[in-house]
């Protein structure tokens, strides 16, 4: 089955956002959640939009396991809004020579592809 989350659609990203979307997500339990992220810093996962950050945070909170999928350019990038502590999700990323990635590996599982 496919479940569609309601709420408002943010036109620039086609993301469902808003209170209705959050309420619906809170009613669900996820075994695994896969999310994109705009930035991964030393301590936090970040995104530029407050409403999208709230959606992502709610999904992470309702998942047994969370995975953040990013390309190497997102490592060390910081966006406006903190989504969650780095420890809250596993990171799936391209192999990177970033020294920051070594620090992140001390805090959470990193899968390099």
Specify the residue positions occupied by each region the protein language model found.
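Conserved phosphate- and dinucleotide-binding cores of soluble alpha/beta proteins
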Residues: 1-113
């Amino acid at each position: 089955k496919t479940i569609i989350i309601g709420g408002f659609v943010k036109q620039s990203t086609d993301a469902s956002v808003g209170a209705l979307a959050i309420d619906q997500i809170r009613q669900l339990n996820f075994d695994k959640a896969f999310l994109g992220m705009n930035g991964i810093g030393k301590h936090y996962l970040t995104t530029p939009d407050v409403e999208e950050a709230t959606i992502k945070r709610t999904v992470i909170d309702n998942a047994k396991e969370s995975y953040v999928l990013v390309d190497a350019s997102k490592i060390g990038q910081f966006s406006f809004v903190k989504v969650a502590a780095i420890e809250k999700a596993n990171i799936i990323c391209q192999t990177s020579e970033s020294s920051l990635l070594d620090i992140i590996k001390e805090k959470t599982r990193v899968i390099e592809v």
